[in-house]
Amino acid sequence: MSILFENCDLLLRGEDGVYSTLHGFLGVRGDTIDYIGTEKPTGEYEEHKSMEHKLLMPGLINCHNHSPMVLLRGVGSGLPLREWLFDKVFPIEDRLVPEDIAAGSRLAILEMLASGTTSFSDMYFFPAETVAAVAEAGMKANISRCVQCFDENQTVEQNTQIPQSVELFEKYHNAENGRIRIDFSIHAEYTCKPHIVRAYSELCKAYGGRMHIHLSETQREVDECIARYGKSPVAWFEELGTLDSPTAAAHCVAVSDEDIAILKRHGVNVIHNPTSNLKLGSGFAPVRKLMDAGINLALGTDGAASNNNLDMFEEMHLADIMPCGYRHDPTEVSSAEVLDMATVNGARLQGRSDTGVLAVGKKADIIALDLDKPHLYPNFDTPALLTCAAHSSDVVLTMVDGKILYENGEYKTLDREKVFYEARAAVKRLYA
């Protein structure tokens, strides 16, 4: 299949990280961008799409998600992290069955496609159901089976989650022509015992996998880890070998200068989750410090239970303005840096060097926004327009690997009514 997008604005990123806008044409052949220019190409395309007043940009990458948790949207609102998790979330999660994960994953995918997300990183339970949902929908995802252990007497052999994680990797890693990748995942320091973490981290390294963890989300987490082990969660994971694999660390709100040095030394990717951190009262991640240290900083929504949506445009908005407010400096973070977090930095975190920007030879993971809106005119700074003015409802097209998955309110690969029917049935059973 080949498509030529005509008369559109194209958001381009130079090698120097500077964004520019070009009015012209973008050609897609198969799963790849094969033309960008101001003149109409001479090659033949099977489909031509007039995109006047539309902006084409890279698809957004949500690097920290628990997609089936859309079924828990709003549960435990108003509680801090520990009480929210242990008193409200865990009891519901104990009742989850695979059918719930299937329903929740597809509902989350509807939300993500309509809001311009083309790829996401997910850690949760019954992950084969999420794999199936992503395969059907046509999205990209890095999916992991979250490993936990609350019993210090449990042996590595007794932990059933570890072999489930390994089986998932062996069965699905690089499935669907690489759209689906399998990561390894440890929930957090406070939900997993050291001997399990060490053994599982060694497995991840042996398989050449990527690791996805929660890390230093709150000061309480850090204080309790120091009381238990005499070191911060960052130092604890380093000692146990977790950071020896390419690691994506969500939150990193309460990190010291020493922690940041460890993260940098191991090339850890940090995922900024501003909405979730605000909603749970967790605090503010030291975004500028992390970036100045040379750490790759990506963006995520967290699960819908602590956000309460999967809207990456809202996430970009907060990531742009929040640090400027609490640091009393409007230059603390630039809109271009935030766009990087949501696109090319996310691609780097997921190990997808072939996406994240619009360029010839890159994968055609593209979204289109309708600029013919009062809140999007005039436009003197496209990155700022996207991070501080655009809404997810401005998205009119979402394409992954050259295939249109969502256009003008219509889903091309999922049956919206069926997804809602199954989601309602899951909610009814869970909360009966």
Language-model regions: role of each:
Residues 1-24, 29, 39, 342-432:
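Active-site microenvironment of metallo-dependent hydrolases
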Residues 8, 26, 31, 53, ...:
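Divalent metal-coordination and catalytic microenvironments
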Residues 71-103, 110, 140-162, 219-246, ...:
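Active-site gating loops and adjacent loop-to-helix segments of metal-dependent hydrolytic enzymes
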Residues 73-139, 162-175, 423-432:
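Alpha-helical scaffold segments that flank or form the walls of functional sites
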Residues 129-253, 258:
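Metal-coordinating catalytic core of metallo-dependent amide/deamination hydrolases
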Residues 239-246, 288-373, 389-391:
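His/Asp/Glu-enriched, well-ordered alpha-helical/loop segment
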Residues 257-258, 264-295, 300-301:
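A conserved active-site cap/scaffold subdomain adjacent to cofactor or substrate pockets
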